[in-house]
A protein has these predicted regions:
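Acidic-basic catalytic patches of nuclease active cores, encompassing PD-(D/E)XK
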Residues: 1-42
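Short, conserved beta-strand edge motifs with alternating hydrophobic and charged residues
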Residues: 26, 61-64, 98
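A conditional alpha-helix N-cap/helix-loop micro-motif detector
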Residues: 41-44, 77-78
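Beta-rich catalytic cores
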Residues: 47
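Conserved catalytic cores of phosphodiester-cleaving nucleases, focusing on short active-site segments
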Residues: 51-53, 57-69
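Mg2+/Mn2+-dependent nuclease catalytic core
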Residues: 67-88
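Nucleic-acid nuclease catalytic cores
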Residues: 86-115
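Intrinsically disordered, low-complexity terminal regions enriched in charged/polar residues
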Residues: 108-131
Length: 131
């Protein structure tokens, strides 16, 4: 699954009254460039995550990742949003990762605190997401 396919999957899955959830996508540079009529490169500020989601009364920033790793995750997978994730967590906010393993063909879920504590994790340390 490509990163874009993974993001679209999460967006479609959690934009659902059945799951008592709604999800909103942050526009990124790729989106803005695709929509630009001139075709010129557009540069936007970095977003704190891919989405913001409310589910069952709890709002959280949501980052979607895909990986080819057989063993688990490493800090490079989370580096881009780490500073913004930490700012959100330090202010008492919620941050969630949905990670798709292309080797295991399944989704995992992790809190921002779990990843911040140690981003180098084995798959057996993660909670499997059944969606």
């Amino acid at each position: 699954m490509t990163p874009t396919e993974a993001e679209n999957y999460i967006y479609n899955k959690f934009n659902s009254k059945k799951l008592n959830s709604c999800i909103f996508r942050f526009q990124d540079t790729r989106d803005a460039t695709a929509r630009s009529k001139s075709g010129k490169t557009v540069v936007l500020d970095r977003n704190p995550s891919d989405f913001v989601m409310t589910r069952n009364g709890v709002t959280a920033f949501v980052e979607v990742k895909t990986t080819e790793s057989v063993r688990g995750t490493n800090e490079n997978l989370f580096k881009q949003q780490a500073a913004r994730r930490d700012m959100i967590l330090n202010c008492g906010g919620k941050y969630i990762y949905f990670i798709y393993s292309n080797k295991n063909f399944c989704w995992f879920i992790a809190s921002g605190d779990f990843i911040r504590e140690n981003p180098n994790r084995k798959w057996n340390e993660f909670e499997r997401l059944e969606i």
